[in-house]
């Protein structure tokens, strides 16, 4: 794969994270406007998020790796796949892109660019959900890269689609996305004061996934037969 310079990779990370957040926030606004049924609105939000992830990881993965997520970049840095400098640059790009994505979604629906959320998302169940969501996402990515690299876009999109429904938090699983969603007082928002719990849980879940997958994906050492002097040729 061709190596792209850091500037291009950071632009790809900002663009991908921004479009991801625009899809999450925008589809939430659209769904909330079209139906009073929260379950139906979540279905719409889920489909849009899963679909855009498949597209973004496919088209931008060869450019930057398509992290779009500080937790993923941290894991890649800890595993030696990304330098500390590049990790810091990726995170800055992801956060900037994510906030821009919220503003873009708002402008498309004729709302103020940024509007602090008042939606409460806190408590042990929510934090556990975010830890599980991030754990599963990172495990999916690492195992996907190890065994089926070409399937990673679909694996990520399908995992997040499922995690929207089996986690109480609807699977943010991404500190940059969580921060950006604190700037929208709409269906997908999160109160700024609830961010620390989410971010800490996401980072812990990601690091735990790295620790487990490092061991799990390590093949067993081959058995070397020792030849005795009597049986040696």
UniProtKB/Swiss-Prot annotation:
Bilayer-crossing regions: 11-31, 40-60, 89-109, 125-145, 152-172, 193-213
Keyword S-adenosyl-L-methionine in record? no
Recorded hits in InterPro entries, A to Z, give: Aquaporin-like (IPR023271), Aquaporin_transptr (IPR034294), MIP (IPR000425)
| Residue span of motif NPA 2 | 174-176
Keywords of this entry: Arsenical resistance, Cell inner membrane, Cell membrane, Membrane, Transmembrane, Transmembrane helix, Transport
> At which positions is motif NPA 1?
69-71
What is this entry's stated membrane topology?
A: Multi-pass membrane protein
What are the GO MF terms of this UniProt record?
Answer: channel activity
Name one cellular component (GO) term. plasma membrane
The UniProt disruption phenotype note reads: Disruption of the gene results in increased tolerance to arsenite but not arsenate. Does not affect sensitivity to antimonate [Sb(V)].
In the UniProt record, does the keyword Cell membrane occur? yes
> Where does it live in the cell?
Cell inner membrane
Q: Name one Pfam family in it.
A: MIP
- What's the impact of mutating residue 177 to R? Increases methylarsenite transport activity, leading to lower resistance to methylarsenite. Nearly complete loss of methylarsenate transport activity
GO biological process annotation, one example: response to arsenic-containing substance
Primary localisation category: membrane
What does this protein's UniProt record list under function? Involved in resistance to arsenic. Facilitates efflux of arsenite [As(III)]. Arsenate [As(V)] enters the cell through phosphate transport systems and is reduced to arsenite by the arsenate reductase ArsC. Internally generated arsenite flows out of the cell by downhill movement through AqpS. Can also transport the highly toxic methylarsenite [MAs(III)] and the relatively non-toxic methylarsenate [MAs(V)]. May be a component of an methylarsenite resistance pathway in which methylarsenite enters cells via AqpS, is oxidized by ArsH to methylarsenate, which exits the cells via AqpS.
Free-text comment on this protein's domains from its UniProt entry: Aquaporins contain two tandem repeats each containing three membrane-spanning domains and a pore-forming loop with the signature motif Asn-Pro-Ala (NPA).
What is the similarity comment for this entry?
Belongs to the MIP/aquaporin (TC 1.A.8) family. NIP (TC 1.A.8.12) subfamily.
Full protein name: Aquaglyceroporin AqpS
Q: Please spell out the taxonomic lineage of the organism that makes this protein.
A: Bacteria, Pseudomonadati, Pseudomonadota, Alphaproteobacteria, Hyphomicrobiales
User: Which gene name does the record give?
Assistant: aqpS
